[in-house]
C-alpha cells in the first residue's frame, strides 16, 4: 500500500531577522517559507514519499515563492489555487540565543483563510493512504473549520490513517474554550494524536504525559505520542502499550520553531514505511533534534541519507 500523504493548510511567507533584537528594531530580514502542514509536507517529500498539498494563495511574491518551494521539493500542487482578492499570509520571526523567538503574524483574512468545504471536496481521498491535519486550519475562519471537519470525517469513512497535531495558536481563536472544544473534537477522529506537554496542560488540564495520553486514547485515538522536549516522547496505544522513547542530545539549540513538525514527519513517514511504532517515534525524535539545530522552520528537515547519518552516529 504505497499511496502517499495528503495535507491541507496555510503556508506563509517567513521573514527571519538577520540579527537579535526586537522585531520593530531589526534592520534586515531573510525570506523563507513556513506553515505547520507545509513543513510536514517538505519533511515527508525529502524522505522520498509521495506528498500532495492543498492551499489557497494570493497572486503575490510570497505565493509564487511558496509554489517554487513546492516544486523544488517535488510536492504535488494540483490543489494549490490562487485568490484574486486575498493575499498570502506572512510572518516575522526574531532571532534569539535563548528560548523561543518572537513571532508576529500577518495572516488575518489571508487567501488560505477562504478555503472551504467545496475546495476540499475536490480531493479524491481514495488516492491516499495517510492524511495529516493540525489545529491551525480550523482556527483560520469558520469556512476552514468546516473544511477541517469535512476532511477528517471523510478520511475516517474512507479508511485513511489520520494523524493530528493540535498545534495550538491561541491568537487565532475567538476564545480558549472554542479552541479546546474544536481541537479535542477533531482529535476524536484521529488514529494518531501528537500533543506537546504544554498543549496538554491547556487542552485537558495536565502536562503529565501519561495523563495526556490516557485522555486522548479515551477520546478516540488508537495512538497518542506526547512530545516531552529534549527528554523525548511518551507513547501510549489502545493495546495498552506505554513507554518512553528517549530524545537525542544536540550540541546547540538554534531555533525550536518547526521541531514539532519535524517530529510529526518522523512518526508519519515511519508508519507509512511500516516501521514498528517505537522505531517511527525514534525517527521522530531524531528529526526534531536535527531541526532545532537549524535557523528556519523547515530548512533543517533531512534527506534520508542525512537522517541515517545522524541516527547512526
List where the protein language model places each region.
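Conserved phosphate-binding/catalytic region of the ribokinase-like
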Residues: 1-5, 153, 209-313
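Short, conserved phosphate/pyrophosphate- and ester-handling motifs at nucleotide-, phospho-/glycolipid
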Residues: 44, 196, 260
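Anion (oxyanion) recognition and catalysis
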Residues: 45, 71, 153-157, 187, ...
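Conserved phosphate/ATP/ADP-binding segment of small-molecule kinases
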Residues: 158, 170-242
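Short beta-strand/loop segments at the ligand-binding rim of alpha/beta enzyme cores
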Residues: 159-166
